């Protein structure tokens, strides 16, 4: 791969020295470099291939880092990272000690706002714009947001607030690629489709390109053109009702259209909204055909594409959930499945195919997803909300107020619990035990392997109230999974190994590591299964027959399962040493999942080491 043009770019300042016509070969080399890099490291691909020209145009037109660019979600920022001095570190992408897969303020002065969760960009850019106004600093503020992210209420809350905020410069760029991770859904997506498919759209786009090539960046002339193009496409838009001056749609891969348009918008004061149309996977045919498959691939050979594994892989927890959901739906016609735009990631593909009328993708709208489930439960339906642990944080008030307070029968399947590996701190599901344990009526189940996941899903589904089952990303220990829909007693654990003096109480998928450590420690291991209700009877037995207890969880130790155990011991008036092992009170960066766990002492060797250090006198 030749990069003779890209080799000359060490910062956006180098871009701005070039003639516009020199950018096309840079775009081609940049796209090829992104493909080659991601194929070697894994990471987000389709979205980054789709933002090459837009990224080039933004850094070419605006004075970054003085001008602020906030990238919504942020998984489309690899071209941005490459152009802002991090090209030589792309080989470390999403690896321990390497660069993040998302914008990160501590990583570069060009990363103006840390993102990874959706729909935050307009709010952040608006805050920056107001701060610049208050400080008397003249700069531009740009929020780049995808059409999938526009389905979240927060984006519209920010636009509504911006509409009544005076004397600021804010440009919102809608990157319309008709995809979030799963295809976007809802009325907004249909509205955007109507804008793009209007009878004047194609003519307007072509004429706009021709006109812009000859338009100098003069304020009045720019306004005249924008009003003319706008009138050809639509007489009024939803975005203008918020107080934004709407421009577009324009081709997001055409630098000759993008750059003059951005230059004109740069001269305007106030609220601007630019609608650009891009294609996920642009320039790599396999990703264009299947942008979902190539959304976040592992390592692969670009010449042949992603291939099926030669040897059968162990079932992932997500696959176990997906199979259970279909089986439970077959047995109970009241079951409905809900996902906030994560059909593939949460394992609902087969469920949608088999039960399309009972499948609901509500878009990137976690608050709505939870309360929608509450409404279904009010009328006798049995909703299962399949959601990443980190994204349930966005619907916490709804969990408390709309579900738990009314003791409604909603089951939460919390995928990606604990450390998630390459996606890092922004996607870690470390806090669910702590923030759910304090909510009355809520059941929290922590399965230790694949079969336990199925058992506890069935158990929580049978419970007539709010319940959550948390399980991690990836595969477990390879346990055989039963075919039935059996349940276990609610709030009851089970002893997996009998030992002496020390008892390890495991919550979740670290139980196999605890068993390995216990062989060397001659310790008892209890698979507690539930954080809430906690098996106090088993706890009392372990306290009475052992000299020390160890609690173990792949979640934040502060407020977690270990805290529940110490609280229960205190309530019972029982006093004995307790070692609480879990995730420390820090944000843990990206890296290999197993290596990160080992780094905080939560592999078998680390568990053994911690127990020996704390209870050396008991172990001799």
UniProtKB/Swiss-Prot annotation:
Q: What does the record list as GO biological process? A: 1-deoxy-D-xylulose 5-phosphate biosynthetic process; isopentenyl diphosphate biosynthetic process, methylerythritol 4-phosphate pathway; terpenoid biosynthetic process; thiamine biosynthetic process
Q: Which keywords does this Swiss-Prot/TrEMBL entry list?
A: Isoprene biosynthesis, Magnesium, Metal-binding, Thiamine biosynthesis, Thiamine pyrophosphate, Transferase
| Top-level lineage group | Bacteria
Pathway(s) annotated for this protein in UniProt = Metabolic intermediate biosynthesis; 1-deoxy-D-xylulose 5-phosphate biosynthesis; 1-deoxy-D-xylulose 5-phosphate from D-glyceraldehyde 3-phosphate and pyruvate: step 1/1
Q: How is the cofactor bound?
A: Binds 1 Mg(2+) ion per subunit.
Residues engaged in binding thiamine diphosphate:
75, 116-118, 148-149, 177, 284, 366
Q: What is its EC number?
A: 2.2.1.7
Q: Which cofactor does it need?
A: Mg(2+); thiamine diphosphate
GO CC list: cytosol
The question of whether Transferase is a record keyword is answered with yes
Q: Could you say which residues bind Mg(2+) here?
A: 147, 177
Q: Which GO terms describe its molecular function?
A: 1-deoxy-D-xylulose-5-phosphate synthase activity; magnesium ion binding; thiamine pyrophosphate binding
Q: Could you tell me what reaction this enzyme catalyses?
A: D-glyceraldehyde 3-phosphate + pyruvate + H(+) = 1-deoxy-D-xylulose 5-phosphate + CO2
Q: Which Pfam families match?
A: DXP_synthase_N, Transket_pyr, Transketolase_C
- Give the family, as the similarity comment puts it: Belongs to the transketolase family. DXPS subfamily.
What job does this protein perform?
Catalyzes the acyloin condensation reaction between C atoms 2 and 3 of pyruvate and glyceraldehyde 3-phosphate to yield 1-deoxy-D-xylulose-5-phosphate (DXP).
Subunit and interaction comment: Homodimer.
Q: Can you say what this protein is called?
A: 1-deoxy-D-xylulose-5-phosphate synthase
**Which organism does this record belong to?**
Bordetella avium (strain 197N)
Q: What is the lineage of its organism?
A: Bacteria, Pseudomonadati, Pseudomonadota, Betaproteobacteria, Burkholderiales
Instruction: Quote the gene name from the UniProt entry.
Output: dxs
